[in-house]
Every structure is written in structure tokens, then in C-alpha cells.
Regions:
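Carbohydrate-active catalytic/glycan-binding domains of CAZyme proteins
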Residues: 1-103
Length: 103
């Protein structure tokens, strides 16, 4: 089972300490982290049935709240990341977005 855990170190190379218990369900991978105000959001791919993109949030890196139900992602979204852009660029990108197609 793949689950996300957290560990601490003074160097990116370790040594590691304070390894957490898993803070996601089973069978997740591809995490991406974004800071939004005082909160940190960790997005991940849940790749067994039902497949979906999930997320948890934390402010202290010790406790995590599952916020998957509060978010929406495009169908079949996998292994993404978050990039900060200006509101102007967001408007321009949305204006150029193609119409959805059915499968």
C-alpha cells in the first residue's frame, strides 16, 4: 500500500526523524504542495477505484484534514502541480480554453 507520510531533517539528505503516520488513504502517489495563505495543501493521485485526485491541508505539518470533497478537478486529472499566476493571465487562459468534448 502506498500512503503519504512526513519526515523531518536538517538537511534534504537526512538523517530523517519524526516520521509520521500516514495522512492519506491507501494507494496514493504523485504529491504536490501549495501554500495558500497560512495553509499548506497537499494534492495527490488516488489511483485505485474509485480513481480521483485528492487533497489534504495542514497549518502545522503535524495534523492533516482531508479536503478532497471540497475541491473539484477535471476528469482523469493525474499528477498535477499548482502554479501561481496573475488574475489577468488566468482570464486570458480561460478565454482561450476550448469547449469540452464528450468521449
Amino acid at each position: 500500500m502506498k500512503r503519504l507520510r512526513l519526515a523531518f531533517a536538517d538537511s534534504p539528505r537526512g538523517p530523517w526523524r519524526d516520521v509520521s503516520e500516514p495522512f492519506t488513504g491507501d494507494w496514493v502517489e504523485g504529491p504536490s504542495v501549495a501554500r495558500i495563505g497560512p495553509e499548506w495543501l497537499i494534492y495527490f493521485d488516488h489511483y485505485t477505484q474509485p480513481q480521483h485526485y485528492g487533497a489534504v491541508r495542514t497549518t502545522d505539518w503535524r495534523t492533516f484534514e482531508d479536503i478532497t470533497a471540497q475541491l473539484s478537478f477535471p476528469a482523469d486529472h493525474r499528477h498535477g502541480t499548482v502554479v501561481k499566476i496573475s488574475e489577468e493571465l488566468a482570464r486570458r487562459l480561460q478565454a482561450r480554453r476550448p469547449a469540452p468534448t464528450s468521449r
